[in-house]
C-alpha cells in the first residue's frame, strides 16, 4: 500500500526537547503503558490523555480515501482509549467499529461512547475472517511489534 499522509498534526515543539528531559525512571514508567503513561506526568508518556476531538480534523481525508460509509467496518488496532473510533462514529453514523488494545488500562478508561466496541487482545491471531474489515487502522501500534 502506498504512503498516505492524513496531515496529522505535529506538535509546536520538537519531540527531541521532551526526550532530553526524560530519565530512566520516566522510561520504565512509560514502558508499563498503564495509568501513569496515559494519565500521569507528561514525562512518563501521554500526560493526561483526554478526548479532544482531534481526529475529526483528519478523518474526512481517510473517509474519502477509503470510501467509508455507514455500511463500512473498521478495526482500530492499538485503539488506546477509542478516540479515533469515537470521532469516526460521530462523522459516519451506523459505521461498524471495533478496537483492539493490548493493554488493559486504556480500555478500562475508554471513551464511554465506544467502550463496548473495544476488546483486549494481542495483535496476532485475531478472530476475524480475512477481509472482514474495510479498513484496519494501526496508528502508533505496529512499530512496537516484533514482525
Regions found by a protein language model. Give the residues of each.
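N-terminal auxiliary segments of SAM/dcSAM-dependent transferases
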Residues: 1-28
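Short catalytic micro-motifs in class I SAM-dependent methyltransferases
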Residues: 140-141
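Class I SAM-dependent methyltransferase Rossmann-like catalytic core
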Residues: 40-54
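A conserved beta-strand element that flanks and buttresses the S-adenosyl-L-methionine
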Residues: 137
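A short, conserved alpha-helix within the catalytic core of class I
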Residues: 145-147
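Conserved alpha-helix/loop element of class I SAM-dependent methyltransferases that forms part
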Residues: 52-69
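Class I SAM-dependent methyltransferase SAM/SAH-binding core
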Residues: 83-125
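Conserved class I S-adenosyl-L-methionine
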Residues: 71-80
Amino acid at each position: 500500500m502506498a504512503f498516505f499522509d492524513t496531515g496529522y498534526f505535529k506538535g509546536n515543539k520538537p519531540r527531541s526537547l521532551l526526550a532530553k528531559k526524560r530519565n530512566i525512571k520516566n522510561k520504565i514508567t512509560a514502558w508499563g503503558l498503564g495509568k501513569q503513561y496515559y494519565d500521569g506526568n507528561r514525562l512518563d508518556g501521554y500526560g493526561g490523555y483526554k478526548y479532544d476531538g482531534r481526529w475529526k480534523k483528519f478523518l474526512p481525508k481517510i473517509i474519502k480515501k477509503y470510501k467509508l460509509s455507514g455500511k463500512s467496518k473498521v478495526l482500530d488496532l492499538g485503539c488506546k482509549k477509542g478516540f479515533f473510533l469515537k470521532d469516526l462514529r460521530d462523522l459516519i453514523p451506523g459505521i461498524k467499529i471495533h478496537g483492539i488494545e493490548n493493554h488493559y488500562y486504556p480500555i478500562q478508561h475508554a471513551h464511554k461512547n465506544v467502550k463496548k466496541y473495544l476488546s483486549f487482545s494481542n495483535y496476532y491471531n485475531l478472530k476475524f475472517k480475512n477481509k472482514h474489515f474495510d479498513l484496519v487502522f494501526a496508528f502508533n501500534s505496529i512499530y512496537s511489534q516484533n514482525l
